[in-house]
Amino acid sequence: MIALIQRVTRASVTVEDEVTGKIGPGLLVLLGVEKEDDEQKANRLCERVLGYRIFSDVDGKMNLNVQQAGGSVLVVSQFTLAADTERGMRPSFSGGAAPDRAQALYEYFVERCRQQAINTQTGRFAADMQVELVNDGPVTFWLQV
């Protein structure tokens, strides 16, 4: 399971001219689900994402996680993160989980975030989405479990 996380001052996702999720300061999480992923991996990745200390403390040091910084989380499914780009000029998506399994794990991940009392907004699974963000820093990390 892969999360591309970006520290943002704001972010939103729109589907068919409807804003489905919008946050102020916090994390934009682009989430990719791979074939071998399960609930245990989703739990570990959620723990890492929410615990990752990439927000500044009073001394300006990256020392706070999203909850300590009072931030929110916007989770957007992105199957392209599981692509194999090793060869050729066209990505292969054979490493991605089947859509039904990917959706179940995506929803599980979102629910785990919400259980941590963090404002968690979402896109719409498998939809064509427009994502807007203001990357703060920029600060972007690739987390994989």
Swiss-Prot record:
Q: What Gene Ontology biological process does one annotation of this record name? A: D-amino acid catabolic process
Provide the top EC class: hydrolase
Query: Which EC numbers characterise this protein's activity in its record?
Result: 3.1.1.96
Q: What GO cellular component entries does it have?
A: cytoplasm
Q: Which SUPFAM superfamilies match?
A: DTD-like
Q: Name one Pfam family in it.
A: Tyr_Deacylase
Domain of life of the organism in this record? Bacteria
Task: Write out the GO MF terms.
Answer: D-tyrosyl-tRNA(Tyr) deacylase activity; Gly-tRNA(Ala) deacylase activity; Ser(Gly)-tRNA(Ala) hydrolase activity; tRNA binding
* Keywords of this entry: Cytoplasm, Hydrolase, RNA-binding, tRNA-binding
Q: What reaction is this protein's catalytic activity?
A: glycyl-tRNA(Ala) + H2O = tRNA(Ala) + glycine + H(+); a D-aminoacyl-tRNA + H2O = a tRNA + a D-alpha-amino acid + H(+)
Q: Which cellular compartments is it found in?
A: Cytoplasm
Report the protein's function: An aminoacyl-tRNA editing enzyme that deacylates mischarged D-aminoacyl-tRNAs. Also deacylates mischarged glycyl-tRNA(Ala), protecting cells against glycine mischarging by AlaRS. Acts via tRNA-based rather than protein-based catalysis; rejects L-amino acids rather than detecting D-amino acids in the active site. By recycling D-aminoacyl-tRNA to D-amino acids and free tRNA molecules, this enzyme counteracts the toxicity associated with the formation of D-aminoacyl-tRNA entities in vivo and helps enforce protein L-homochirality.
The Swiss-Prot or TrEMBL record describes its family as follows:
Belongs to the DTD family.
Q: How does it assemble?
A: Homodimer.
Q: Which NCBIfam families match?
A: D-aminoacyl-tRNA deacylase
What is the UniProt domain comment for this protein?
A Gly-cisPro motif from one monomer fits into the active site of the other monomer to allow specific chiral rejection of L-amino acids.
Protein name per Swiss-Prot or TrEMBL: D-aminoacyl-tRNA deacylase
Q: Which organism is it from?
A: Salmonella typhi
Q: Which gene encodes it?
A: dtd
